[in-house]
Amino acid sequence: MPKLEQFEIKKYWQIFSGLKPVENKVNHDQVLPILYNSKLDSSILNKIWFLADIDDDDNLDFEEFVICMRLIFDMVNKNIDKVPDELPDWLIPGSKAKLVKERKQRKQIENADIPKVETPKIDWYISPEDKKSYENILSGIQTATDGSYSYSSTTLVLKSKFFNIGTSDFEKTWKLVNPKNFASIDKDPTLYFIHILRQRNDLGCNIPSELPKALLDSFSKERVTYDLNSNQSQVTRSSNVRSNTNMSQHTIEAIRMNEIPRGNPNDAASLEIELNSLDAELNRIRDEITRQEDTILIREQFEGLLSYKEQQYQKSKQSSMSPVKLNAKSISDDLSNIEQQVGVLENYLADKKVELQQLESQIQSVNK
């Protein structure tokens, strides 16, 4: 991790001055737009804030602000893989060295007084009370046409309930309960998905690397889908059929799971198969539309930051007596970049809505 350069400190001073510090300090609300714009997990941002706030007053003076900004930029630019547990010596300002040393000593004393407790393991038993609670959560999750649950629709709801869990924990747990990597999973593995995440959030349990054998066998069973492009199975026919009426008949010798060929368009059964295929495709598009809610949330954050920058720019024009003037060109560039990103998100959402409408029209034409 490269050390601080003079040009960095000047850049951080411009940002710090633009936040209108009071008594040379900024609070969390003032820094919040910068934190949001970094797109880092809240757990990472909380740890960075804790390290930077050396005097523990819930505010950052300029020296502490420099620490906060440098750690954020290093994480965003992937100069470091994770936030350090302790500040490196070169990032500790001389005026704060004593406070950092005292805080480290307090932490050591506190850790010495606390008996070491092993991280609890996941309890695989789901009590009737827990199951009822999980089913209440499931009732608020959008399901596919076959009643299964996708990753995007499930995590969208759970992120508002489990605040101590990062994206990596969601992904690791999903892979655990979905060993076959299906696009969506049934109710039982989804219940265990919630069960594991709840214990991770509330008790700090480690996410296991494997399932108990009984659960693994259950969750690995093939699911029936209506995807005509699936390679799950093949349809074979037998022509050796006897008939008392001397009429030629064909019987299906084996149809395993869901590989069904597209038949004669005039055949009612074939049309039903095509309808099932379109239903499956519609479900996929709806899942993507669900994911747009995350996009809309990001868009709202960008718009909030845009509004903040506009207010900041207007204040800078009016405050000609301010000792430190904001860089108007920099702010203008920021506004332009944010507007472009919002535009891209809007166009992406519009395209997905058009795709959904086209698919619904196809289904309606098949139903006629």
UniProtKB/Swiss-Prot annotation:
One of its GO terms (cellular component) is endosome membrane. One of its GO terms (molecular function) is protein-macromolecule adaptor activity. Residues 8-98, 130-222 form the EH domain. SUPFAM superfamilies: EF-hand. The keyword Repeat applies. It comes from the Eukaryota. It holds the Pfam family EH. CDD domains: EH (cd00052). InterPro entries: EF-hand-dom_pair (IPR011992), EF_Hand_1_Ca_BS (IPR018247), EF_hand_dom (IPR002048), EH_dom (IPR000261), End3 (IPR025604). Residues 40-75 form the EF-hand domain. It is found in: Cell membrane; Endosome membrane; Cytoplasm, Cytoskeleton, Actin patch. Its main location: membrane. Component of the PAN1 actin cytoskeleton-regulatory complex required for the internalization of endosomes during actin-coupled endocytosis. The complex links the site of endocytosis to the cell membrane-associated actin cytoskeleton. Mediates uptake of external molecules and vacuolar degradation of plasma membrane proteins. Plays a role in the proper organization of the cell membrane-associated actin cytoskeleton and promotes its destabilization. Component of the PAN1 actin cytoskeleton-regulatory complex. This is Actin cytoskeleton-regulatory complex protein END3.
